Amino acid sequence: MRTKINIKVVVGVFSFLLPLSFLFSSCSEQMDYKEYSIYDAAYMQKKFERAGGLLSTIYADLDSDFGNYDGATLSSATDEAVYSHDGNAIESFFNGAWSPANANSSLWTTCYHGIAYCNLFLDEFTGLTFDDYVLDKNYMAEMYQYNNYQWEARFLRAYYYFLLVRQYGGVPLITSNMSADDASRQPRATADEVFAFIDSECEAIKDQITKDYGDLGDLAMSPANNGRANNLAVLALRARAALYHASPLFNANNDKNLWQKAAELNKAVLDSCSARKMKLSTDYKGLFIGNTNWSDSKATGEIIFGRRMPTENRNFETYNFPVGMTGAGAGGGGGNCPTYNLVSAYEDGDSRKEQTIACNGDSWPNANTVPLETYYGGVNGLPNAYATPTGYYLKKYVTESVQIAGNGANTCKHVWVTFRLGEFYLNYAEALFNLSGDGYTAPTGYAASAKPSYYINQIRKRAGLKDMETGLSAADFKAAYEKERFVELAFEGHRFFDVRRWKEADKYFTNIQGIDIKKTADGQFTETPKTVQTRQWNDKMYLFPIPQSEILKSGGALTQNPGW
């Protein structure tokens, strides 16, 4: 018989103790937070919703980036964007202020918070029978859902460890409940060990977790469990983690076995998507608009897994609407402004450009039909406060139809796309190229059709582009691939970490450009590239510093990352 649980489990790992009450919620589309006290398994199995609530609490720690740095996103610490408000916290990444004492991220605490809840659930709350409900008509469906929670918890724990390892390298591997004192003294596992844990967990649960919540027959719950991790999310996590493990940051000796594994696992995602009849969306912009990607099949048909924000709001729109708008569009903050580095990467005719970036002369549909004036002296340009310093405004993830000011102000849904099919075409192409060394030839032992260029071209076709140029040298093909990934995944949280895992930040992240737009007397415009920011780079920044507070709490068990 289980006894009352010692509630002093670690949640921030070393930062704070779990309180006597948890915020629990049901697993419906909107997080419905309720407060419960947890004492033991007997209490937990009094109601199914208590177990479901604990899982929802774990899901609530999933990452997103709708302006995590006072409106700025990580894109504004890359060559994707410049944040239009001087002095924003995002500048610490490149102005010399970044340090263990100013660690620039709460992810360490957030991830270990989620991991602690996963360990709590797995150690204490599996194997319950909910005997009081045996005669209920929904008992079998409720039990099916409950029994699936353990696989979801293991997926979420593995996902949190992926977030940690890509940011810090090796971290403490805590896989069971322990006291805060014990947890604070755990040494770092190596990055290889963390990647191995992620891989083994995904292997163990991939055939256990639900494959499709929409195809459960009599076991289906109402409302449908949209947004929960399924078999495909597990495959996607495993494949992405393998790609990172094979990359130069974590694979200094270029071990081809790691690239082989990355290729196999990313191909498995493509094959699984094909078996489910998933295709690249015909609505690229809709992939990132919450009122669309929440449920619209044209968009959701490409999305593998996403983080649904619990409440509707207009915060991201307020951060990123152009300044100088009137009426429904008034009140925008300029925000994360795309760079000329990004804009110049788009080829002529690339449909992704107009769905990602607003340029001088474009219209902003909800506000008015007057073209945007991002030129110097224009309504939406400098020297107006917070106007774009680059000449461009952001469209991607921005719901342009939202009214952010006045009596008609409204809100919208937001879904952060964690995994989508398009990424895995690119991942597979990258792994194949690193095996073959040639962009147009399949690696030894692969089918002749397994050419890196083929999978890149699938992405280009959706954008309305011709196949990529043939006959490129290995170096030029690599550059073309990196450019394709740059534009396809812009503002999705990849660039910050892609350039780091390639160890190419000194190439991409130092000279940040915009355009200087001038209106001539005859109403024409001149556009001249200009340097907007010259950013500092030091190779120690390939990994984050571990927060100094955590180092001190460890009593010497935790070692700091090199250079910090």
Please report, for each region that a protein language model flagged, where it lies by residue.
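C-terminal substrate/ligand-recognition segments
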Residues: 105, 359-455
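Bacterial N-terminal signal peptides
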Residues: 12-23
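Conserved, well-structured interaction surfaces
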Residues: 49-52, 56, 60-64, 86-168, ...
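Acidic, serine/threonine/proline-rich low-complexity intrinsically disordered regions
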Residues: 171, 175-178, 185-188, 236, ...
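Long, intrinsically disordered, low-complexity segments
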Residues: 27-28, 59, 111-114, 197-199, ...
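Bacterial N-terminal signal peptides that target proteins for export
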Residues: 2-14
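An aromatic- and glycine-enriched ligand-binding surface/loop that stacks and positions planar moieties
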Residues: 28-91, 169-171, 195, 199, ...
